[in-house]
C-alpha cells in the first residue's frame, strides 16, 4: 500500500532539505576475497577493478557474452587487504553469485554471499554525511565510521551516504542516526528522487535484455582501457562504431501510470514503463528505455486506458 500524498510530500521535503533514513532489508552483498580477487573480477566486470585503491570503489556491470546486463553493482575495497565487496540490487544478486561462483574454478578466490550478515542503511539528503559522522565522500568511496557504537562502512552514494553495518548492530546504528536528526522515509519517497535524477535501477529500467549503452551508464560503469571481460566486444563495437537502438528517457504522464505498462507510438511498441511516481516538484514522471522512434518531444500511448506521456531528455528540466 502506498503512503498518503501528504505524508509523501513531507518525506520528500525531508530528503531534499534535511536527511531521510531508508533501510534496505533485501540488499545484496557478495564478498570476493583471495590473492586473485581483483584479477578475477577484472575479467568479469566492465570497470577497472584492479585500479580500485583501499577506501575507494567503482560502479560496474556484469554482462553475458552478448553484452546484456546480468547485474550492476558497486565494487568497494573497504580495507588494505585483497577483499572486495559487491553491493547489488536484489534483482541481480542470484545471477551475479551464480556467475562468479561458476567461473572462479582453479583460482585463489573465494566468493561468499554476505547479504544476511550485514544490513544497508541509506542516509539521503544534504545532512547525510554530518549525521553519519563521515566526511563528505565521493560516490563509491568508502571509509570506516562508528555510529552509536556500531562499526560501519560508510559509502558515498549519489544522494547521500550508505552505511553497511553488521545485521545484529543495525538497530543500534539506526537509533543513533535518528537521534542525530535523520527521519525515517519510505522507499516510495526515495524513489521519487531517483526518478527525478534520471538514474536507472536494475530490476526497474534495466534488466537482462539491457545493454549498458541503452541505459546511459557507459561513462560511469565501463572502462575502455582495461583488459578483456565477458561481453566486451559488443560494448566496444557499439561504443566506437554503432548506435544503440534504445535509450533511457524521461516520461511526463498525463495521468496515472504503472511500471510494466506498454508504451506505443501509433501501433508500434517502443518500450515499457520502468518506474513511475508523482513528484511534488515535477508532477507525474517516470523512466523507461525506449526505441529510437520515441525521441524527446514525442508522445507515447501508455497502456490501454488513454493515458499518454511526453518523452523528455534526461535530466528532467
What does each model-identified segment do?
Residues 73, 210, 215-223, 228-232, ...:
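Glycine-rich, small/acidic residue-mixed loop/short-helix segments
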Amino acid at each position: 500500500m502506498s503512503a498518503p500524498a501528504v505524508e509523501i510530500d513531507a518525506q520528500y521535503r525531508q530528503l531534499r532539505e534535511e536527511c531521510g533514513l531508508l533501510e534496505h532489508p533485501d540488499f545484496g552483498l557478495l564478498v570476493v576475497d583471495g590473492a586473485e580477487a581483483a584479477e578475477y573480477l577484472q575479467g568479469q566486470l566492465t570497470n577497472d577493478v584492479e585500479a580500485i585503491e583501499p577506501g575507494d570503489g567503482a560502479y560496474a556491470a556484469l554482462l553475458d557474452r552478448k553484452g546484456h546486463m546480468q547485474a550492476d553493482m558497486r565494487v568497494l575495497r573497504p580495507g588494505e587487504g585483497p577483499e572486495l565487496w559487491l553491493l547489488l540490487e536484489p534483482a541481480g544478486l542470484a545471477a551475479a553469485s551464480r556467475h562468479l561462483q561458476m567461473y572462479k574454478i582453479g583460482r585463489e578466490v573465494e566468493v561468499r554471499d554476505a547479504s544476511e550478515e550485514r544490513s544497508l542503511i541509506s542516509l539521503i539528503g544534504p545532512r547525510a554525511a554530518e549525521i553519519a559522522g563521515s566526511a563528505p565522500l565521493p560516490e563509491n568511496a568508502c571509509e570506516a565510521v562508528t555510529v552509536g557504537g556500531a562499526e560501519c562502512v560508510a559509502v558515498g552514494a549519489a544522494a547521500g551516504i550508505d552505511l553497511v553495518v553488521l545485521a545484529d548492530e543495525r538497530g543500534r546504528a539506526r537509533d543513533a542516526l535518528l537521534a542525530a536528526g535523520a527521519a525515517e522515509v519510505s522507499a516510495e519517497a526515495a524513489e521519487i528522487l531517483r526518478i527525478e535524477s534520471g538514474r536507472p535501477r536494475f530490476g526497474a529500467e534495466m534488466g537482462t535484455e539491457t545493454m549498458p549503452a541503452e541505459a546511459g551508464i557507459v561513462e560511469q560503469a565501463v572502462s575502455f582501457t582495461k583488459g578483456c571481460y565477458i561481453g566486451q566486444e559488443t560494448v566496444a563495437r557499439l561504443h566506437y562504431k554503432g548506435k544503440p537502438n534504445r535509450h533511457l528517457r524521461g516520461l511526463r504522464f498525463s495521468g496515472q501510470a504503472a511500471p510494466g505498462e506498454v508504451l506505443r507510438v501509433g501501433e508500434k511498441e517502443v518500450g515499457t514503463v520502468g518506474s513511475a511516481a508523482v513528484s511534488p516538484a515535477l508532477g507525474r514522471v517516470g523512466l523507461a528505455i525506449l526505441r529510437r522512434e520515441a525521441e524527446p518531444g514525442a508522445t507515447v500511448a501508455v497502456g490501454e486506458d488513454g493515458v499518454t506521456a511526453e518523452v523528455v531528455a534526461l535530466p528532467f528540466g
